[in-house]
Amino acid sequence: MSKKNTDISKFLSYILRHQPEAIGLSLDKEGWVVISDLILCAAEEGYIFDNNLIHSIVNNSDKKRFTISDDGLRIRAAQGHSTQQVDIRYEAKIPPEFLYHGTATRFIISIRVQGLNAKDRQYVHLSADEETAIQVGSRHGKPIVLRIKALTMYEQGFYFYQAANGVWLSNSIPYQFIQE
């Protein structure tokens, strides 16, 4: 992805996940916004892009952070919201036996005490494979991958969800279900 497209993708993540009001947007409860409204509000803040570029970024992103509606008129972040405007209703799913969480080693002491909590997001994000978890953890420093006993959690009454981009979500992960 070109630097311009990467910059726009980061801008879209910021707006669609965290601060839509920063450019005067409101998201609906499911996180959707009309693409033409997004383009106009972004232009007023100096971010210039068009419908074709948005579709290109969404379609060519390996992380699949965004979803475009079936009619092609709206966009939303697939998951990762901290804004309270959004409450996507994911359908609960039975997880695989293990899921993975990538983090930085400097957070491990806190995790041992508190488990994994969503903090300023709505869910804890989990990966289906270790490689993805390593990439996620590397963004925050020296990575460590935690193996989550997801199926055991599910059998004990915890819920798991899966976003459209394949990221697994849970409200929290108590430490007794985490393997270092």
From Swiss-Prot:
Taxonomic superkingdom: Bacteria
Entry keyword annotation includes Transferase: yes
One annotated GO molecular function: tRNA 2'-phosphotransferase activity
EC number, as in UniProt: 2.7.1.-
InterPro entries for this protein: Ptrans_KptA/Tpt1, RNA_2'-PTrans_C, RNA_2'-PTrans_KptA, RNA_2'-PTrans_N
SUPFAM superfamilies named in the record: ADP-ribosylation
Record's keyword annotation contains NAD: yes
UniProt family annotation: Belongs to the KptA/TPT1 family.
Alphabetized Pfam families for the sequence: PTS_2-RNA
Entry's Gene Ontology BP terms: tRNA splicing, via endonucleolytic cleavage and ligation
Role summary: Removes the 2'-phosphate from RNA via an intermediate in which the phosphate is ADP-ribosylated by NAD followed by a presumed transesterification to release the RNA and generate ADP-ribose 1''-2''-cyclic phosphate (APPR>P). May function as an ADP-ribosylase.
Protein name (Swiss-Prot/TrEMBL): Probable RNA 2'-phosphotransferase
Group of enzyme by EC: transferase
Source organism of this protein record: Pectobacterium atrosepticum (strain SCRI 1043 / ATCC BAA-672) (Erwinia carotovora subsp. atroseptica)
Gene3D superfamilies, A to Z: 3.20.170.30, RNA 2'-phosphotransferase, Tpt1/KptA family, N-terminal domain
Keywords: NAD, Transferase
